[in-house]
């Protein structure tokens, strides 16, 4: 199983004067960031500041495109056409790429947010749209995904995939996430989350909510910055992974090219 993982958090998910989570503290722990691109959260000032901080701290920059749903934080399903999904992703990735270029950096990966992130695992049309956008803008980008339609479509197009394990979410028996609308979808016990994460990385297994052992091969662990005690949890997960002999590091460009 993976002995090296990229520790990623969703950042820049505020709007105007409103901020969600302690991004500065999380940036001391994580190795990469999924940065909101203005549709579900984020705005030009927040994107600019977040990219600048990632560059200053050596944290990998990732685009976190979502549905155009500020009110619902991108967590509500939207029935869009394939073209609409593609153009929305192109728009958001283009915006973040411009901020990265301004600060002398580049976007390294793309990780769909929220309900879009769930649907691309099961809807081939949405998966194709994301891969089409990414492969035309920069085929050297990684796509972060769970096993499913998006991962399959990316591999078929020659785009490198980072398989994501989500530390604080419950899984169904088929390996998909339990919808947030259902009880128990989000796990809050820090000890349980840390234990599940270490097992996921070192043994390649995560237990579903029904106790089914699901095989996984993650090289990326996602932490949500909008949960209570997110910073303390991130520190604990990193410490326990390192105690288990896991190297915490973002992939380099050479790493990505070697997997192509």
Question: Each PLM stretch: what is its role?
Answer:
Residues 123-129:
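Charged helix-capping and loop-helix junction motifs
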Residues 24-28, 49-62, 101-104:
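Acidic (Asp/Glu)-rich catalytic clusters
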Residues 29-32, 55, 136, 140, ...:
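Glycine-enriched alpha-helix->loop->beta-strand junction motifs that scaffold or abut catalytic
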Residues 10, 64, 110, 223:
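Conserved, mostly hydrophobic/aromatic
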Residues 19, 23, 33-40, 71-86, ...:
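Glycine-rich tight-turn/loop motif centered on a GG-T
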Residues 69-112:
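Glycine/small-residue-rich loop that forms an oxyanion/phosphate-binding "nest" at active or ligand-binding sites
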